[in-house]
């Protein structure tokens, strides 16, 4: 029978000092012996996805204490990728994931907490907490802040739906008036919550449902809706049950590594492919798998991407649907239900509710459920009122969207395409693979060839795009922006947005060893591995080289012979300690970022730290 970790600090005469300090936090004799559960919050006023979380930790803590546990709250940092984007701040975004994972480990292990409730929401916070959870392997429940309502405004007497990406694109579009640009900006992000499309934050919060570590509705129920409060209340109650199941009944099924096992990771990736999720999820799932010693690799993603159809199309791939529409159609459980009926899921998985996948779908898939409360929860809709407050409205859609032929979520027979929303490409330009969000690629661009325009920083690429130096048919190469070369693997949302602003969104390709925002669409290929800084062939591309992209065949190649590439490699090596670094880039890199770069692996490994360099 496992012993409560917290007993290390609460039992025994030699722990009198620790108990004295616990008493100073409000604990009493009656609390010593109860499970100490960490409420891992991520409230900050910097990030709209987290601005409403201040009181939600207290809400969870109250439920923990009422159920017989002791709750202790702490906060992690949270970076807003949208605010950090387009300048040096983006260098810090991906490295913050490791900082978050480490800070959770530090706090939980230093104080011997028995379990956790992770209150996350935005891009690197959910992955960082997920990595920590699998590293620590103590009972955990994820409950996120929820998605933002989609923006809505009238332009030319037409009501349109908006999100952050629209503000970025139209802000740089010379054909959009200042007045219209300002109106879009003011309307794009109307409420608290994670940005309203299938961007990285919402993708990851959906995947925690598929992994079995969060409750149904976690990924899609709006931040502003009163029903979301129930998820927080239930998380506080349920974590005490999970904790006691493990420590008092020796029930290993309560542990995250026994919930988020390989079959669950495959289900999460299948979901991601089916819903056209952010390419960043690939990076984060690979990283989380390594933390949990799960044998889940790029090869698995490639295999799955060839089998799974595209069942759910959401912004930025279409402006018709946002997360509020996914929720109305049944959310993650609705998509999983269609995948299950298509025979594509591993059914031998369980979750924090203690239910198998078939049991969960029977209760929470709106196409199967007879539970009126479940149906009502999926009818939770937007209010259209600007607010930063959680649970501030109780609006409902009049009906559910159960149209699996023409609705937001489709059955396999009526899929948007039989090819999934993400694909792994490989070839001489990406020998260890790269990722493209096929859900956002125009059908005419699935096979594309063109001359390379080579840039050694995102800034240079943006200047060239806005300066008219990139023309239709070009393949824009942005290199030395990988985990090591950036450092920090910047998101390339501004270059892709500006290609659209210049009318080139469907006329050019963009390839990078950096990554893309979940808001990216178009022929945007990222995570090229090995990255340029690790000697990847992307570092040998020269201006005018022809690049061939074939998404149906999963190929990406540089049309340059081996002899020429060998000569270019020799020229690189002749640069000595400057080899595999950008030639003319002016960039200030702090000590903290240099430390990150010294251990960073390429994207095909999840951009995690190279344990072999630490003797691990």
Swiss-Prot record:
The modification N6-carboxylysine is found at residue 124. Signal peptide: none annotated. Its EC number is 4.2.1.9. Its cofactor is [2Fe-2S] cluster; Mg(2+). Binds 1 [2Fe-2S] cluster per subunit. This cluster acts as a Lewis acid cofactor. Coiled coil: none annotated. Keywords: 2Fe-2S, Amino-acid biosynthesis, Branched-chain amino acid biosynthesis, Iron, Iron-sulfur, Lyase, Magnesium, Metal-binding. One of its GO terms (molecular function) is magnesium ion binding. The keyword Nucleus does not apply. Mg(2+) binds at residues 81, 123-124, 491. [2Fe-2S] cluster binds at residues 122, 195. This is Dihydroxy-acid dehydratase. The lineage of its organism: Bacteria, Pseudomonadati, Pseudomonadota, Gammaproteobacteria, Enterobacterales. The gene is ilvD.
């Amino acid at each position: 029978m496992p012993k409560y970790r917290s007993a290390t600090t609460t039992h025994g005469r030699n722990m009198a000092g620790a108990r004295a300090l616990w008493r100073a936090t409000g604990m009493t004799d009656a609390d010593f012996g109860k499970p100490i559960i960490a409420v891992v919050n991520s409230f900050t006023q910097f990030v709209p996805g987290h601005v409403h979380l201040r009181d939600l930790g207290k809400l969870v803590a109250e439920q923990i204490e009422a159920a017989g546990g002791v709750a202790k709250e702490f906060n992690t940092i949270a970076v807003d990728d949208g605010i950090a984007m387009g300048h040096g701040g983006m260098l810090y975004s991906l490295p913050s994931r490791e900082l978050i994972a480490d800070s959770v480990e530090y706090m939980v292990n230093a104080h011997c907490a028995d379990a956790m409730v992770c209150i996350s929401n935005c891009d690197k916070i959910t992955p960082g907490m997920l990595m920590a959870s699998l590293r620590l392997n103590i009972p955990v429940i994820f409950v996120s802040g929820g998605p933002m309502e989609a923006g809505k405004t009238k332009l030319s007497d037409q009501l349109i739906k908006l999100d952050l990406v629209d503000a970025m694109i139209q802000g740089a579009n010379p054909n959009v008036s200042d007045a219209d640009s300002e109106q879009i900006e003011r309307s794009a992000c109307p409420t608290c919550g994670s940005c309203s499309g299938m961007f990285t934050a919402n993708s990851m919060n959906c995947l925690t449902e598929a992994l079995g570590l969060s409750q149904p509705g976690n990924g899609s129920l709006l931040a502003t809706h009163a029903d979301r409060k129930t998820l927080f209340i239930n998380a506080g109650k349920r974590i005490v049950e999970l904790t006691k199941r493990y420590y008092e009944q020796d029930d290993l099924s309560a542990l995250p590594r026994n919930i988020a096992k390989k079959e669950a990771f495959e289900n999460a990736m299948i979901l991601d492919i089916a819903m056209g999720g952010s390419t960043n999820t690939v990076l984060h799932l690979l990283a989380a798998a390594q933390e949990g010693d799960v044998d889940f690799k790029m090869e698995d993603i490639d295999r799955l991407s060839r089998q799974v159809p595209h069942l759910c199309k959401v912004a930025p791939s279409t402006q018709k649907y946002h997360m509020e529409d996914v929720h109305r159609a049944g959310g993650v459980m609705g998509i999983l239900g269609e995948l299950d009926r298509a025979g594509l899921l591993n059914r031998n998985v369980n979750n924090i509710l203690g239910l198998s996948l078939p049991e969960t779908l029977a209760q929470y898939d709106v196409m199967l459920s007879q539970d009126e409360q479940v149906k009502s929860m999926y009818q939770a809709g937007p209010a259209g009122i600007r607010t930063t407050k959680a649970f501030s409205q109780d609006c409902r859609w009049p009906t559910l969207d159960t149209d699996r032929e023409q609705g937001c979520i489709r059955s396999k027979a009526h899929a948007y395409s039989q090819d999934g929303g993400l694909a792994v490409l490989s070839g001489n330009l990406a020998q260890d693979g790269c990722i493209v969000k096929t859900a956002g690629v125009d059908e005419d661009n699935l096979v594309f060839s063109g001359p390379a325009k080579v840039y050694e920083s995102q800034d240079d690429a943006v200047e060239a795009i806005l300066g008219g130096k990139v023309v239709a048919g070009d393949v824009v190469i942005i290199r030395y922006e990988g985990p090591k070369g950036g450092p920090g693997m910047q998101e390339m949302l501004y270059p892709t947005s500006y290609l659209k602003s210049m009318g080139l969104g469907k006329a050019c390709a963009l390839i990078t060893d950096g990554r893309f925002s979940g808001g990216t669409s178009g022929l945007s290929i990222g995570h090229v591995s090995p990255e340029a800084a690790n000697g990847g062939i992307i570092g040998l591309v020269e201006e005018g080289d022809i690049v061939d992209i074939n998404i149906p065949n999963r190929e990406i190649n540089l049309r340059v012979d081996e002899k020429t590439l060998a000569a270019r490699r020799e020229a690189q090596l002749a640069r000595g300690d400057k080899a595999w670094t950008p030639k003319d880039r002016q960039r200030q890199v702090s000590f903290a970022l240099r430390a990150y770069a010294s251990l960073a692996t390429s994207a095909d490994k999840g951009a995690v730290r190279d344990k072999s360099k630490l003797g691990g």
